[in-house]
Design a protein with these regions (language model features):
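Mid-to-C-terminal Rossmann-like scaffold of FAD/NAD(P)H-dependent oxidoreductases
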Residues: 3-5, 222, 262-356
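Glycine-rich Rossmann-fold phosphate-binding loop(s) that bind the pyrophosphate
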Residues: 11-14, 141-146
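Beta1-alpha1 glycine-rich phosphate/pyrophosphate-binding loop at the start
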Residues: 2-73, 153-177
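A short, polar/charged loop-to-alpha-helix boundary motif
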Residues: 355-369
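FAD-site-proximal beta/loop scaffold in flavoenzymes
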Residues: 115-136, 207-280
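FAD-binding core/adjacent interface of flavoenzyme oxidoreductases
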Residues: 2-8, 63-139, 201-204, 214-216, ...
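Rossmann-like dinucleotide-binding cores of NAD(P)H-dependent redox enzymes
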Residues: 137, 146-201, 301-306
Length: 370
């Protein structure tokens, strides 16, 4: 794009780093400045819970996902105070003029329980991992992906002391993702691992002094700094188009983009929600194309979740409908699969130790960019 000399990136997690890498790969030679309060080398977040007692801090650069120094990104080690549009429609990040701003601030965990641990940063994970061995019990509020991963990590660590309790105020394990369809599967794993599961029960107030409390009850897009009028989705994320351009009144805000967990892409009648690693990984390609005026990727990848729990490699691709019962299969190469279809069309697939089936579903569910 003509006149594009300085791009600001707010956040240096996976989505922000990939946006910088894709801009350079597409030929951008101008100035890149990034803001992030976490003053350390960018790292991958999923291992913080999956590998709570193992190699939980894995730098993105070591995985080939992007090295900010090597990409020539100047990093300001503080949170962006604001992103604003001037009366002349010029963008400023913390008072610094930029030609385009990419918002990649992710989603911050809910913090509503006094004294509870959350796992969002490497420091959060380190504090929790250090506290657990000295406790009599670990009480986890929330049976979503984070809560079940932490339960798995603690139960599988072979620690002699703490018992693990998993409390969920709804009646389902991973209810937001599966609407009750996987309760029997996960309950079997949890109970076999010795986890005490309490469904339909919020964690009661008042805790034993020797109990560790973990809040894993969801998150919200981290956008308090944004001083630009923009459309929001039901979960509070920024609404974008397929090129990650932030929308206001249904039209793109010039120069403003949002990637990863803080953004949901509106694709006709479908919404591709943030909150998933693969969206953070892939959004930068579309952003770079939009900023530089080059063709974007032909396909938009579907929503995808990966998890390692109770000795199993788990993958979910697509969005599970609440009104369709899954078909269960056992592929010839092993593992198991749950498939959601409507009128012969695949909507979502859950694989347990069946990566080949997941790969096929991923290809079937991608959307051609309109």
């Amino acid at each position: 794009m003509d006149g594009m000399e300085h791009v600001g990136i707010v956040g240096t997690g996976l989505a922000g780093v990939r946006a910088a890498a894709e801009l350079r790969a597409a030929g951008f030679t101008g100035k890149l400045t990034a803001w992030d309060a976490e003053d350390r080398e960018p790292y991958d977040r999923p291992p913080l819970t999956k590998s709570l007692f193992g190699e939980r801090v894995r730098p993105l650069a070591s995985q080939g996902l992007g090295d900010l120094a090597g990409l020539g990104v100047r990093v300001v080690p503080e949170a962006a105070a604001s992103v604003k549009l001037s009366p002349s429609r010029a963008l400023r990040v913390s008072g610094v003029a930029v030609d385009a701003a990419i918002l990649a601030t992710g989603a911050a965990p809910h913090r509503k329980m006094p004294g509870a641990h959350v796992v969002y940063t490497s420091d959060d994970a380190a504090r929790l991992a250090a506290a657990i061995p000295h406790s009599a019990s670990v009480r986890i509020a929330g049976a979503g992906w984070i809560g079940t991963e932490i339960a798995s990590a603690v139960a599988s660590a072979g620690l002699p002391g703490p018992r693990v309790e998993l409390w969920e105020s709804s009646g389902h394990i991973l209810g937001r993702s599966f609407h009750g369809a996987v309760d029997d599967l996960w309950l079997g794993w949890l109970e076999e691992s010795g986890v005490d599961v309490r469904l339909d029960q919020p964690l009661p107030e008042g805790q034993d002094a020797d109990a560790i409390l973990v809040q894993a009850t969801g998150s919200a897009p981290a956008l308090a700094f944004l001083a630009v009028e923009a459309d929001r989705t039901a979960r509070g994320a920024l609404a974008t188009d397929s090129l990650t351009r932030v929308l206001s009144g249904g039209s793109p805000v010039p120069g403003l983009y949002a990637v990863g967990d803080c953004a949901d892409a509106l694709l006709g009648e479908t919404t591709l929600e943030g909150g998933h690693w693969t969206k953070a990984l892939n959004d930068g390609k579309a952003t770079a194309a939009a900023i530089l005026g080059v063709p974007p990727p032909a396909y938009i990848p579907p929503v995808e979740v990966f998890s390692t729990q109770f000795g199993h490699e788990i993958g979910l691709v697509g969005t599970v409908p609440a009104d369709v019962a899954p078909a269960r299969e056992e592929p010839p190469r092993g593992g198991s699969v749950m498939r959601w279809e409507r009128e012969g069309r695949l909507l979502a697939l859950l694989s347990v130790d069946a990566p080949r089936e997941l790969s096929r579903a991923r290809k079937a569910l991608r959307v051609r960019r309109g």
